[in-house]
UniProtKB/Swiss-Prot annotation:
Disulfide-bond pairs as recorded: none
Keyword vocabulary terms for this entry: Cytoplasm, Ribosome biogenesis
Cellular compartments annotated: Cytoplasm
UniProt record, GO biological process: ribosomal small subunit assembly; translation
Organism placement in taxonomy: Bacteria, Bacillati, Bacillota, Bacilli, Bacillales
NCBIfam families: PRK00092.1-2
InterPro entries: Ribosome_maturation_RimP (IPR003728), RimP_C (IPR028998), RimP_C_sf (IPR036847), RimP_N (IPR028989), RimP_N_sf (IPR035956)
One GO CC term on file: cytosol
Biological source species: Staphylococcus saprophyticus subsp. saprophyticus (strain ATCC 15305 / DSM 20229 / NCIMB 8711 / NCTC 7292 / S-41)
Entry-linked SUPFAM superfamilies: YhbC-like, C-terminal domain, YhbC-like, N-terminal domain
Similarity comment: family membership: Belongs to the RimP family.
Record's keyword annotation contains Manganese: no
UniProt-recorded name of the protein: Ribosome maturation factor RimP
Function: Required for maturation of 30S ribosomal subunits.
Amino acid sequence: MSKITEQVETIIQPVLNDLNFELVEVEFTKEGKDHFLRVSIDKEGGVDLNDCALASEKISEVMDAEDPIQEMYYLDVASPGAERPIKKEKDFQNAITKPVFVSLYAPIEGSKEWLGILQSVDETNIVMEVKEKAKTKQIEIPRNKIAKARHAVMI
């Protein structure tokens, strides 16, 4: 996590708490010549366009007051969607029995990417049920080897 995203999280977390929204993720990226501050929010039952607009307005107010980002940027507040990132311990626990996609820093059993059903989670590992050809198997992945994890839509 970058210093900017850490600062932004610290600034906007109280605002989102007051609105009863969960802060899912903050990203600050440059695309071409433009900078984007992307904030993903959620709440019980999901967020709609009005929730995103309200959060955007309140985040904008506090960001303008605190001004932690020197560059001009576009603020984008959205729901995390069906392929929500899995980052926090709570996210991993909530994903048990659900389809997930995991990208690794280094290959395990010849692959850096795994798609399957999350079976269990502990402090050091996750266990996924994955399909390989026509067979189903369980694979144990050390959590410190996970670059990114997210919910997946399996068809």
